[in-house]
Amino acid sequence: MEIFNFGQASDHRRLPDFGSGGFLQSLDTNPFLKNQYYNNSVEALELCKKLNKMGISCDMSIWTKPEEPFRVDPGDFGAKTLHESFGFDQNLTGASQIHDGFRNFSSVRVQNNNFHGVSPSPGLLGLQDSFNPNGFEEMMAFKDHKDFLLDHINEPIKRSPFLRGNDAFKGSLMFEGIRVSQILAAMEGSGASYPDEPKINGGLPLDLVSMVEIYGSVNLMARDQIGCRALQKLVEEGTVLDSKVIFLEIIDHVVELSMDPLGNYIVQKLLVVSDEEQRTMIVSVLTSKPRELIKICLNTNGTRVIQKMIKTVKTKQQIALVKSALEPGFLVLVNDSNGYHVLQSCLEFLVPNDNKFVVEAATEYCAQLATHQYGCYVLQCSLINTVGLQHERLVAEISRDSLRLSQDPFGNYVVQCLIDQQVSSVNLLLPFRTHCIELATQKFSSHVIEKCLRKYPESRAEIVRELLSYPNFEQLLQDPYANYVIQTALSVTKGAVRARLVEKVKRFGKLQSNPYCKKIFSKTILKK
């Protein structure tokens, strides 16, 4: 069996300097090559200290030659003898040509391996990560397993079960924390070149197989900043094969990726670019467990995915799945800062017959929602996006309680929304009669009275008449809120109604120096 030793590589290439005195001079001093052996323990210890400063773990055992070969369970990886370097079978199906950067290395062997749909490169990466989290050069020796992926397109690229159960491996993934930037930076400067491949960030190869070789799986790649961007670009601009592989790799991890700070972006992208069959599969996974779906909706990242899902669903099957899963969680969603956005999306992007479940629930709980911080938004959205009988029922419920809602910090916005839609003023303003003074002198309800003056010309005379009949009219002029109501009345009224109001205001000319009365007594308003 032919063996290659990284320590004997003759093709020396400069690696990037991380600011540690330029100690990364060539492949001979690359800290990521785990097969380097130093006879001088002091020199090795110094290098370990430098690595630790960079946040890279360093075990002194990797600098010494093992006394006996280390063997991995053949059931997981085949018979591999680890003695100065890994051995690989040159005849392995799907193995690609060794890259130019390793032209001077001896041939590579893997013995008795049968991956059954598992890409040999991710398997190799997993093995390296498990025993030496800083090693990656062996992994770079394999590239472009396109033929292998084509043969196994329906089988996900996955790690060995042996590695998935290895706690040490889980805690030492090469892309965790700050080390991913250092390792990827080292790769860019290691001398490896990909002349005909598109790049991401000007350095790394934008090729699915190459990227999976780095990260180990599409699922893990989606959780990394660089990897996530690369996946989105591949889905949007890559080949059909790339898109299909990414979809098959991610579909089983959609729920957890939806709540991941980075992974949620690739799920959103798939919802947009996938065909109807693939989109139906994603919707089915997300809605299969209603409680899980509600949890995603309440998550800061997950709510974006669900909103995107609602925006992109088109078929009756997809819409039915969304409705049946969201309906039981209405009250939970409407009381949450993330959840209420999902209900708003239902109202905005689903047709009236499909968002009916939201409107009916909003009508039933109208009194509670109107005075709630988030519920008031759902009610306003319901008013804007409903028609016919549903709209009439909702308007009737709000109008019945308009006096109380007008004085509420949140309810006043719901009443103003009704006024903006110019619904019949008969029922809406009926509760306001004999209460205009009370409403005009309050912070929230004063906005409602101003809105009535602007939107309902038929109500202006009645409101002004009630203001003029107030015995302490002078007090209204100096009131921090009522003075705005009087200003608005002077601006919108005409004829005899306005003339009576102007005459009453001029009687209190002594108040024109009052800070609240300055605008009322301005020539512009009084001479209009």
Curated annotation (Swiss-Prot):
Entry GO MF terms: RNA binding
SUPFAM superfamilies (alphabetical): ARM repeat
GO biological process: regulation of translation
Keywords for this protein: Cytoplasm, Repeat, RNA-binding, Translation regulation
Intracellular or extracellular location(s): Cytoplasm
Pfam family name, one: PUF
Residue ranges annotated for the PUM-HD domain, each copy included: 188-528
Keyword Ribosomal protein: no
Entry keyword Repeat: yes
Transmembrane residue ranges: none
PROSITE patterns from the UniProt entry: PUM, PUM_HD
Repeat (Pumilio) residue spans along the chain: 213-248, 249-284, 285-323, 325-360, 361-396, 397-433, 434-465, 466-503
Gene Ontology cellular component annotations, sorted alphabetically: cytoplasm
Domains (record comment): The pumilio repeats mediate the association with RNA by packing together to form a right-handed superhelix that approximates a half donut. The number as well as the specific sequence of the repeats determine the specificity for target mRNAs.
Function: Sequence-specific RNA-binding protein that regulates translation and mRNA stability by binding the 3'-UTR of target mRNAs.
Protein name: Putative pumilio homolog 10
Lineage: Eukaryota, Viridiplantae, Streptophyta, Embryophyta, Tracheophyta
This protein's encoding gene: APUM10
